[in-house]
Design a protein with these regions (language model features):
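C-terminal hydrophobic helical "lid"/dimerization subdomain
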Residues: 2-14, 200, 260, 304-351
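Short N-terminal strand-loop motif that marks the start
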Residues: 1-78, 140, 350
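Glycine-rich phosphate-binding loop and adjacent beta-alpha segment
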Residues: 203, 253-325, 351
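Glycine-rich beta-strand-centered segment in the early N-terminal region that forms part
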Residues: 34-50, 63-110, 144-152
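Hydrophobic/small residue at the entry helix of a nucleotide-binding pocket
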Residues: 166, 190, 214
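Adenosine-nucleotide cofactor-binding segment
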Residues: 181-187, 199-261
Length: 351
């Protein structure tokens, strides 16, 4: 993987700056470019904050097919409507809006016609299909927009538009009921939000982390129980079984080995809900699934309507991301911090 240095590329006198990836695996470039104009059905957003998500590696390293370069990453965008394209009437200039992973859909494929916009065959993704939020201004289709509640700051709202919606949406579609034992694997960028949401949903939350030093934070975030996966006394799966077996395990840390080791911690009809993305296979035997009618399901983000639900729920319950902020000009440093796994816990660019 290329190192994350940024070079400044001078261009003609223009009006905004952007942090772009010129080619797959290349260093970030801070460039000057013209402020884009919105086409019909689009709006221009004056970006106030943009989260730096692990999924940005797809753009940075060219791991998503069909990306056209240079490309500006960023799909956790919070800003203000700056200009309306032709035919846009449902949004107003000056309105606070956000754009998440779901950057648009075609409305014509089988999934869209059935209302399953999350699985649109031709889904657009901000920062992949078109330039994202690592810049002062960006253009997005109206179907990608979500209104940001006034009580949420831009830096708090931005991570909720990907990390937040992913954990919130996965949990509310997991089949768990209030009072059920729900385990959250990992206390990081996704996990620290998953613990908060699970607590507010009324679940009995077991947080699974590495090392006893994470116990206090897990309890502060809302966990009833902390399980140290490095303990030599009992495995995490055994610890869950002593609690009766988990109805749901929300797997947030991208470690297939760790996920595989937790399957035996599921109770009857238990579900391993996977949101931590990795290309390595999860190892499971048919007997593990058949015994107790266990299932494994993946979940990816959601629609702007789901984002709206996430923001409203966070507004009402006080769920907030823990963040570190960097100015746009330090995008390379912010990205490297995120990739190091040492950030506490979401990294956000500010404009």
């Amino acid at each position: 993987m290329a190192t994350s240095r940024a070079t400044v590329v001078p261009m003609k006198m223009t009006q905004m700056k952007a942090a772009q990836v010129p080619n797959p695996g290349a260093d970030f470039q801070i460039v000057e470019c013209e402020i884009p104009r919105p086409d019909a059905g689009h709006v221009r957003i004056k970006v106030q904050a943009c989260g730096v998500c692990h999924s940005d590696v797809l753009t940075k390293e060219g791991l998503w097919p069909g990306i056209q370069y240079p490309r500006v990453p960023g799909h956790e965008v919070a800003g203000i409507v700056d200009e309306l394209g032709a035919g846009v009437s449902e949004w107003k200039k000056g309105q606070r809006v956000g754009v998440g992973w779901h950057g648009g859909h075609d409305n014509t494929c089988r999934e869209c016609r059935r209302g399953d916009f999350r699985n649109c065959r031709n889904q657009k993704i901000a920062g992949i299909s078109y330039d994202g939020g690592y810049q002062h201004y960006m253009v997005a289709p109206v179907e990608a927009l979500v209104a940001i509640p006034e009580s949420l700051s831009d830096v708090d709202a931005a991570p909720l538009l990907c990390a937040g919606i992913t954990t919130y949406n996965a949990l509310r579609h997991s089949g768990a009921f209030p009072g059920d034992l729900v385990a959250v694997q990992g206390i990081g960028g996704l996990g620290h939000l998953g613990i908060q949401f699970a607590n507010k949903f009324g679940y009995k939350v077991a947080a699974i982390g590495r090392g006893s030093e994470n116990a206090a934070l897990a309890k502060k975030l809302g966990a009833s129980v902390y399980i140290d996966s490095t303990s030599t006394t009992a495995t995490a799966a055994e610890a869950l079984q002593k609690l009766g077996g988990a109805r749901v395990i929300l797997a947030t840390a991208p470690s297939s080995k760790a996920m595989s080791a937790l399957i035996d911690g599921l109770g009857p009809n238990g579900k391993l809900m996977v949101i931590g993305a990795t290309f390595d296979p999860i190892e499971v035997t048919p007997v593990q699934l058949i015994s107790g009618s266990r299932t494994i399901q993946g979940w990816a983000a959601g629609t702007p309507a789901d984002s709206q639900d996430t923001l409203r729920f966070a507004e009402l319950t006080g769920v907030r991301p823990m963040i570190e902020t960097y100015p746009l000009e330090r995008a390379a440093e912010a990205y490297a911090r995120m990739m190091s796994g040492k950030a506490q816990f979401r990294v956000v660019l500010t404009m």
